[in-house]
């Protein structure tokens, strides 16, 4: 298996962009290149890599339109960052220390930090700090995405502000506890709040725990619908900047526990060999000769978090069941994808938690939504979802996830 010319050009552009360099591409279709970059939330970096090359003169109208897109995206990110920083100060003033994770912490590793786009800002709070942090957000004009009486049953709550740009997700647990396979991922971070690090005015996890979280977060999305190239960039840059602060043997042991070691090794290989992020991996990581190309192709095809199309999104229930079966040894048929267990449905349809007898109605609502979505998207069908799910299950077997 190998990358096609369009995929090669895209990876070259990303590599150049995250290093602040120019990308000289061969026979590139720049319209397709920018479309892929949009899907991957990497347009600012890709555009920055090609805007000073001879391609500009040959595609002036296209480049002018993309330039405006980039300006809008970066400006929006800058405003969102500033608003989040002001909000975070409110937590600190009250003696609260929510942990900042993902995009906000990773963006500072890039040459142009606001080119690293984030749809939201994520904070991880202790049980004791959850309601105080919620109250501060509400007092500062934010609105929660769930009613007050459901707050304590949620793993995460999203907050938005009218006429504001910030979108904050507050996590009581870093992984969704309604999906059985993620419960043991949460256990790795039980003591995270006892080992905080201060970084540029934010509290975050120590470098090792952050590395583990980035890998497991990527793993969570991969076994669902897929992951994007941006996550490879984040993990690679984190590895490079914090090589000496990461306990690599322990990291391998932790990843092995959840069958994510080969998957992580493939990501490190992509970062090293395709994205030009240089860092030395000690044993046992350095011993892996796993092919990373299948993972790379799947990630380019799927877009950020595998959200490029409904076929891929709908295939996720099948792949998730396959992963669960591999983890607990319990065989699950296609019916478990159509009729998920009550614990899963409670998280998606809150009325099931209040009235368990409405579970059949929630199943019906879920099926109706699927029928509506497939009707609106002619390229999507149950057969195509099953076909893609089988293909992705084989991919997961390549990395010993299943």
Can you say where each PLM-predicted feature lies in the sequence?
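Conserved NTP-donor binding/palm subdomain of two-metal-ion nucleotidyltransferases/polymerases, i.e.
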Residues: 1-119, 125-402
